[in-house]
């Protein structure tokens, strides 16, 4: 523990010098404020009333997301957390023990979109990390610009690589808490999103955000786009000039704790056989780890799966707080920070690994450092802090199988062939040598089957019927548990007390989802090229921490059912602003001390 504390102090001291070199940009003078003499007494009274209302609001909302942080990590590793990190939030905040995502798929983009829109993919439009776009006739990313289909993109990427494209929030179809707050304050509130992943920075911040910043694996810079401003702020340019990515990618990754026994106790053996996946070597899956730059365009990709990319984010976040003047006046600002490295590590090693345990302990210490920094700059008494995750993760299937659980991988190609064979059998013309059904299926993406609707109309095929043909065929493939059809979901024809069906319905968007949605059996998932993944409607993927700390909430442990979709409406209630446009979450009233900060 002594070594850990010294490391944290050293990091804080070294970074203080970096902050000073960046300057403390006189942001308060730059903020737009109503000014000039007041000549109408009634107007003066109204302004004083408004000042009183805003003075009671938190000056900063800080949303901390740890990508792929399952709820049980709090229990498995909690006694090893330090006092100022997650232990502090559990002690001083309101914590919900039964917070589950109420949608499927449980991926990064839908999770991050849910957090600040207060609603599900069916309403906010972010149905997956990527999906088949019928209009574009290709797979599109959740933050690729909808109109970026040419070599002349609508927006420019600042400080990125030559082949990297600008990302935007324009596929998000609902407002966020930040959007509503900026409308309430006429743009005076600042809303900034930060992450390694573009989607994790962009989606929680919203469409009317001040800025979103993410990490370029091509340049090692923190980047953004002309969607937000005409040029990158000077302080960001200065931060990038410090080349912190070069420093962190050179850092070896040893275990944080000196005692390997603690890791064996909580995570089993190191370098378990199920971690050796694909081309991984024994050295790749064993502590200590080392990183080096790629010799390809994505030079800094190895840093993604290093815990030190979280340190890079921490430094950048502290620089943003200082240089943007966040939390320095009565207009509430929002800062969202998503630690992505935990997800990369979890995918490569699984949730029951030394690496996942180690990065979880390191993240706890990074959160403690951030809370201390915010306390010194703004005051935690003036801050609403939220801690959660975007999803959980399943055990590595081979690990589950070794424990006599039904773990396996389902071949996408075999699944697709079974579906096509059933369609040929039902609709093929026996007197023709050509397969007339060959163009009926456009894509199998994220367990969604997309049909060629034009081809079905051409051959007068009933969509409702072919949905059932394809779904029944999928059920014959080992590992597929259930299916739901577009026809069924558009009618909301699901059992009211079926939580799996409800999560599928909440994840279904009629414009973006497929025509048949498949659900795998627990501990089984569709073929992937990494050891562990997520996306199911089962508890290991849906159950996440939900902690809110700050004025207006009674600290304690709450056992009521909750969902991360409840975060945005609860914060809106506390701040006294309009809830996001499509908000479907509930206000977590059981923890509220006062109705709102009005």
Briefly describe each language-model feature range.
Residues 36-94:
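Active-site-proximal N-terminal segment of extracellular/periplasmic enzymes that hydrolyze or transfer
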